[in-house]
Amino acid sequence: MAGEIPDLVAQERTGTGKGAARQARRDGMVPGIVFGGDVDPLPINIPFNVLIKKLREGRFKSTLFNMKVEGHDDVRVICRDVQRHVVKDLPTHIDFMRLKRTTKINLFIAVEVEGEDVAPGLKKGGVLTLIRPEVELIVTAGDIPDHVTIDISEMEIGDNITISSVNLPEGAKPTIDRDFVIAQLSAPAGLVSSDDEEEEDGAEEAIEATEE
């Protein structure tokens, strides 16, 4: 579960528009905007190196931050969009939304797997496919989970895990009503091919017997 809310320090951007955004990038900043909460949008700049480090740490868009901007009250925010350079894939603009701790929000939460070392299906050569490495959940802003865990320790070949069998964090629920599959354990390709060949051979023998 989420622990202490990390700080994210930004600077207020005095200018607006493309010209001010370009100047911010030349100064080693990434321009952004903070919106929502019945308050006027606040243009900001975040140091490029700081933002890159945060992005590389992972789960940036599912992390609740305490944003600190000089001259403004601290506010809890969550990232809603990171625009990137089409060629370099580096951040060029970032959007944050203000939140209260009790605000409900839709977020994609990472799925982590446990029990791989003892899963009988894997020991028999089965292949685990994580169909959804992330699941979209409705969560409370003040209690955003780092991840959800699926336990495959008892999975056999042919089994799957659906969202209804996952212990979700308290207060969290899926955005989709249907019981969708998160992971499945399939037979290895070679075994599937062998089974298919055996079925075909059996069918041919049956046809030959009929013709005789």
From Swiss-Prot:
GO BP annotations listed: translation
Name of the gene this protein is made from: rplY
Family per record: Belongs to the bacterial ribosomal protein bL25 family. CTC subfamily.
Sorted UniProt keywords: Ribonucleoprotein, Ribosomal protein, RNA-binding, rRNA-binding
GO cellular component: cytosolic large ribosomal subunit
One annotated GO molecular function: structural constituent of ribosome
Designated name of the protein: Large ribosomal subunit protein bL25
Record field: compositional bias (Acidic residues): 194-212
Organism: Roseobacter denitrificans (strain ATCC 33942 / OCh 114)
Region (Disordered) residue spans: 1-24, 189-212
Alphabetical list of NCBIfam families matching this protein: bL25_bact_ctc, PRK05618.1-2
